[in-house]
Amino acid sequence: ELVALDLPAGPAFVVALRAIWDAGDAALPIDPRLPRPAVERRLDTLRPTRIVTRQGNYLRPGGIPIEPGDALVVATSGTSGEPKGVVHTHASVTASAVATSAGLDVDPDRDRWVACLPLAHIGGLSVVTRSLVTGTPCTVLERFDVDTIESEARRGASLVSLVTTALGRCDASGYRVVLLGGAAAPTASPPNVIKTYGMTETGSGCVYDGRPLDGVELRIGDGTLGAVGEVLVRGSMLLRSYRDGTDPRLAGGWLPTGDGGRIRDDGTLVVYGRMAEVVVTGGEKVWPVPVEAVMATLDQVAEVAVWKRPDPEWGERVVAWVVLRPGAEAPALEEVRALVGSEVAPYAAPHEMVIVEALPRTPGGKVRRTDLF
């Protein structure tokens, strides 16, 4: 069966997940923050056969069984439309957990994870699943809380997974390792922070600080070293399929990520952003991420997202949405344009800057660029 887990994060969630696996079933975590109509749409789309809530365990009519070996169905973050159900097997979950633990030199007798990200999304759920697979202790919090995150480190927790906004709100220096996913990482990160790259289809982060984990292969477009193109990933931690039965992988098992990037001469991956988010201005392609990274170095800027608006002359123009630091005044547009022009390219400099209170984000911390307008 596919069992929807409509429970808050915490020990009861972990107990229920373990019981589902022990019964040979697969779990579909439901985000408890969703309004009820959104939950019902999610259930109608992904069609679990049973649902577990605080009130009990119920059959759900019209559900579709899983394939043998399936472990999870996880909704994508939905930055580009209605979330899909990504099917992961016990083999792919194990491969991801083992590769992560090896890459971080995790010792179950020494280390302890803290799970504080939403468990309905792969970044939070993978902390719990790798704990179950490897036997590493894990403290599961119902939600991110600054005081609790800091106090858990003082109590001996050594590993935590955060998104950029959460990292900026707490002191995580007490952890041996902080995995950072979601939105673009700050240019200057603490020494215990590892910047991760991955997605629901890859079973969470599969590239750490630009280097693929064991068992992960990377390719760019046609394979030309140093060229900019779509990032392709291959490895045993990839999804089996989507819930509707479609398989996004190409011939040879390569998964097209939809992200643009390149592989440096030293083998490390640089990701520039979603292929669909490239701004084409005056015939030149502008990737948002490099522009955001440069603007983030300005003292006045707390957060920034770069995208586009239609332009009658240039086709599209580069626009920066900026969240200011408390008490800061907005930098002059001319200053921003000069900085970006000198660090990235003159044509990449924003034509417009919009000051906002906050950036729209997915539960996983990624900016929803389509909601910037």
Question: Which stretches of residues belong to each language-model region?
Answer:
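Conserved ATP/PPi-binding loop(s) of AMP-dependent carboxylate-activating enzymes
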Residues: 212, 223-252, 274, 284-286
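AMP-binding/adenylate-forming catalytic core of the ANL superfamily
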Residues: 235, 260-348, 367
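Conserved AMP-binding/adenylation subdomain of ANL enzymes
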Residues: 95-112, 120-159, 213
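Conserved AMP-binding/adenylate-forming
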Residues: 1-34, 111, 115-118, 285
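Conserved pre-ATP/AMP-binding loop-to-beta segment of ANL
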Residues: 60-75, 82, 105-112
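Gly/Ser/Thr-rich phosphate-binding loop
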Residues: 158-162, 166-212, 217-221
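AMP-binding/adenylate-forming catalytic domain of the ANL superfamily
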Residues: 345-366
